[in-house]
């Protein structure tokens, strides 16, 4: 279902003066959120869908910028007229979360108390903090309840958190390629990535902005590690195998295999535009996410607070958040008599499958959204 792109779009900025008290104990006295919208909010304001981004995502979900036609939104293939998130029917909202590096208040923003970039002094943010900030944006837009809150990976965790924190404001939650909490292995991956950044000599305790430098080497390594976990072994084998860039071994430590070249390219590209402090914050938000902790680890008790209908989707080759993790959420919801649709989709792209255009996958989302009553 190719549909159409939403075309040229423009980001918007919302400023909030009301202090936001964070789970970490920190306080943001004021903050900005950058966001984009697609489609038209109906008179009843009942057709709004919030799209939450994953670790490296942002507000630019769909379309392109007039002066940057190649800057396509990260989920453009699913948003637009005739696509699952049909902008002829729905009003789509995407934003850059607090702590981000794409315009919303984050570590690279000026700390009003010092007049310098926040850097490492920016308070740790949790998924629930994002949800509260997003709720204030909904208030600003006049949206009392979302037709749906959705996202993949860390975005799916935000959708899950919305359904628990503001059950009366979410009619449907679409949780894709997510988990109710991170496994020890996932926490370990995140810690290694953070150590790559923290031990970079150019990190300067998180205040590298003042030194006119960036911990590029550490961020590059962190992204290379993360990227491996986003792909499936089968996909990497099919795409790269053991192919060499040249016809013979060089017997050195330079790039020889095509997979090495790919990972270094991805690391360099990411380190060129992303902020290391934001990467640290996002990975900690992932580590801390565990709504069931409020109920002594009982996810069924936690999900009893929800009221929404749910679509839970997982991918067969996602070894970072396996289908078994999604089924934990499904089981907890069914134990509470919730209306749950579950899809286990056979795609070969590993964790990144949620970003891909696939007829079956998009058909599942489209069929679910078609049944939403506005």
UniProtKB/Swiss-Prot annotation:
It comes from Dechloromonas aromatica (strain RCB). The keyword Membrane does not apply. One of its GO terms (biological process) is homoserine metabolic process. GO terms for molecular function: homoserine O-acetyltransferase activity; homoserine O-succinyltransferase activity. The keyword Glycoprotein does not apply. Coiled coil: none annotated. It catalyses: L-homoserine + succinyl-CoA = O-succinyl-L-homoserine + CoA. Gene3D superfamilies: 1.10.1740.110, alpha/beta hydrolase. The active site is at 153 (nucleophile), 318, 351. SUPFAM superfamilies: alpha/beta-Hydrolases. Substrate binds at residues 223, 352. It comes from the Bacteria. Keywords: Acyltransferase, Amino-acid biosynthesis, Cytoplasm, Methionine biosynthesis, Transferase. This is Homoserine O-succinyltransferase. Belongs to the AB hydrolase superfamily. MetX family. Homodimer. Pathway: Amino-acid biosynthesis; L-methionine biosynthesis via de novo pathway; O-succinyl-L-homoserine from L-homoserine: step 1/1. Residues 47-357 form the AB hydrolase-1 domain. Transfers a succinyl group from succinyl-CoA to L-homoserine, forming succinyl-L-homoserine. Its EC number is 2.3.1.46. The record marks 320 as: Important for acyl-CoA specificity. It is found in: Cytoplasm. Pfam families: Abhydrolase_1 (PF00561). One of its GO terms (cellular component) is cytoplasm.
């Amino acid at each position: 279902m190719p549909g159409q792109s939403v075309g040229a779009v423009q980001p918007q900025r919302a400023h909030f003066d009301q202090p936001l008290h964070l789970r970490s104990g920190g306080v943001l006295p004021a903050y900005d959120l950058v966001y984009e919208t697609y489609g038209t909010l109906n008179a009843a304001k009942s057709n709004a869908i919030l799209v939450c981004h994953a670790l490296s995502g942002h507000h630019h979900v769909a379309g392109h910028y007039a002066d940057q036609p190649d800057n396509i939104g990260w989920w453009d293939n699913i948003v637009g007229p005739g696509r699952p998130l049909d902008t002829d029917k729905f009003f789509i909202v995407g934003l850059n979360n607090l702590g981000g590096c794409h315009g919303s208040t984050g570590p690279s923003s000026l700390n009003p108390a010092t007049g310098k970039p926040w850097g490492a002094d920016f308070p740790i943010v949790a998924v629930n903090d994002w949800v509260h900030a997003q709720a204030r944006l909904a208030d600003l837009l006049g949206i009392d309840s979302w037709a749906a809150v959705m996202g993949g990976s860390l975005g799916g965790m935000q959708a899950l958190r919305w359904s628990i924190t503001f059950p009366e404001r979410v009619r449907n939650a679409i949780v894709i390629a997510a988990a109710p909490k991170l496994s020890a292995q996932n926490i370990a991956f995140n810690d290694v990535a953070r150590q790559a950044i923290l031990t970079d000599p150019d990190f300067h305790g998180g205040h590298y902005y003042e030194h006119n430098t960036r911990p590029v080497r550490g961020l590059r390594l962190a992204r290379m590690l993360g990227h491996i976990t986003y792909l499936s072994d089968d996909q990497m084998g099919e795409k790269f195998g053991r192919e060499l860039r040249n016809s013979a071994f060089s017997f050195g430590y330079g790039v020889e295999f095509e997979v090495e070249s790919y990972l270094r390219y991805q690391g360099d590209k990411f380190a060129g535009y992303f902020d290391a402090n934001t990467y640290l914050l996002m990975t900690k938000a992932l580590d801390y996410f565990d709504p069931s902790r409020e109920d002594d680890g009982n996810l069924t008790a936690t999900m009893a607070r929800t009221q929404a209908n749910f679509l839970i989707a997982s991918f067969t080759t996602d070894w970072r958040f396996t289908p078994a993790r999604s089924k934990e959420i499904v089981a907890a919801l069914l134990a509470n008599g919730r209306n749950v649709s579950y899809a286990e989709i056979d795609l070969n792209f590993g964790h990144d499958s949620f970003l891909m255009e696939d007829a079956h996958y998009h058909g599942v989302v489209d069929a679910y959204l078609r049944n939403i009553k506005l």
